[in-house]
Regions:
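Glycine-aromatic micro-motifs
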Residues: 1-290
Length: 290
C-alpha cells in the first residue's frame, strides 16, 4: 500500500475521484510544503517549495491504482512527475507520494490559499457557511452592522469526523477550532451567504493575519449534504479554556439549532472539560427561558 497526497481533481467529490474508488481516505485536511498553481493545460499542479503550503487529502492506495495513476498523469513523460513528500496532518507527519508539475508544465496562476476546493467554490450559484463557534451567535454580527448578510439560515448542521477544540490562543483564553477525529462530530449553524458575508468572515477570523484559514467541508443539514465554507486554526496549540463572554456566544448561538445530545456535550465541555466560571448558571437560565 502507498500513501498518496492529492490536491486537485482527485479529491473527494471532484471529477477524477472515482479513480481512487478502492482507496482509503485517511485525512481531508492534510498539507505539504509546496505552491499550488492552476493553468489552461490542466486543472491544477504543485511545485514543491520550502515556503508555501498546499492543502489536500491523504489516501492509502494499492499498487494497481498507482500504476493506473502513473499512466493517467503521464508520470513517465513531462506532464506530471511522481515525487516523494512529507505530509502533515493534525496528528502526524508521514511520507507519501504526490504528483507534481513536470518541467515542461506551462506557468500558471498561484492560488493564494493553496486550496483547490476553495478556489473552485462555489461551483454553482449557492454559497454556504458552516459556523461552529461564536459566529453561530448574532450579537457581534449585529454590532458590526452586517446582520442582513446572515439572515438566510438553512438550519442546524453536523460535520462528521471532526471534534471541537480551543486551540487558538488570545489574551483572555482559547478560541474555537475544528480538528479531524474519525470518532467525533461537530454541530453548528449553516448559513446561505454572499461574497460580502465572506469578506466580513475573512476579516473577523483573522485570515490575512494568519490565524485561521478558510477550507471547504461537507456538512449535513435536514437530511441534505452541503459543501460549505468554514475556518480552522493554522497553528494549533494545546486547548485553552475560553473566557465566559466567548463560551456564552457559542452556547447561545448553538442553542436553537443543535441536537440535545450536542447541547449536553457543550454543557459538559464548559463545566467539566474546560470549566468556565459563570457558564453553569448561564446555561440553566437559558434553558428556563427558552
Amino acid at each position: 500500500m502507498v500513501r498518496l497526497f492529492v490536491y486537485g481533481s482527485f479529491c473527494k467529490g471532484d471529477n477524477d475521484h472515482d479513480r481512487l474508488d478502492d482507496s482509503t481516505l485517511l485525512c481531508t485536511q492534510a498539507r505539504i510544503m509546496a505552491t499550488l498553481f492552476k493553468s489552461h493545460a490542466c486543472d491544477a499542479y504543485v511545485k514543491l517549495t520550502q515556503t508555501g503550503t498546499v492543502y489536500g487529502e491523504l489516501h492509502e492506495v494499492g499498487d494497481h491504482i498507482m500504476e493506473q495513476l502513473d499512466e493517467y498523469n503521464g508520470a513517465a513523460g513531462a506532464v506530471y512527475e511522481r515525487n516523494s513528500v512529507t505530509v502533515h496532518t493534525d496528528h502526524e507527519s508521514c511520507g507519501a507520494v504526490v504528483y507534481t508539475g513536470g518541467e515542461e508544465m506551462e506557468d500558471g496562476e498561484a492560488l493564494p490559499h493553496g486550496n483547490w476546493k476553495l478556489d473552485r467554490y462555489p461551483e454553482g450559484n449557492d454559497m454556504f457557511y458552516f459556523a461552529y463557534g461564536s459566529c453561530m451567535d448574532l450579537e457581534r454580527i449585529r454590532k458590526a452592522g452586517v446582520e442582513a448578510l446572515f439572515e438566510d439560515v438553512v438550519g442546524g448542521a453536523s460535520l462528521a469526523h471532526f471534534r471541537l477544540r480551543f486551540s487558538h490562543h488570545v489574551h483572555d483564553g482559547g478560541r474555537a477550532d475544528i480538528e479531524e477525529d474519525h470518532l467525533s462530530s461537530v454541530e453548528g449553524v449553516l448559513y446561505k451567504v454572499t461574497p460580502p458575508a465572506v469578506d466580513y468572515l475573512y476579516d473577523r477570523e483573522g485570515v490575512y493575519e494568519g490565524h485561521y484559514r478558510p477550507t471547504i467541508v461537507e456538512v449535513m443539514s435536514q437530511g441534505r449534504t452541503y459543501l460549505a465554507l468554514t475556518f480552522t486554526v493554522i497553528n494549533k496549540r494545546e486547548d485553552k479554556v475560553p473566557p465566559f463572554h466567548y463560551a456564552k456566544e457559542i452556547y447561545r448561538g448553538a442553542f436553537p439549532y443543535v441536537s440535545t445530545r450536542y447541547k449536553n456535550q457543550l454543557q459538559e465541555l464548559f463545566t467539566i472539560s474546560f470549566p468556565v466560571q459563570g457558564m453553569s448558571t448561564y446555561m440553566k437560565e437559558l434553558e428556563l427561558h427558552r
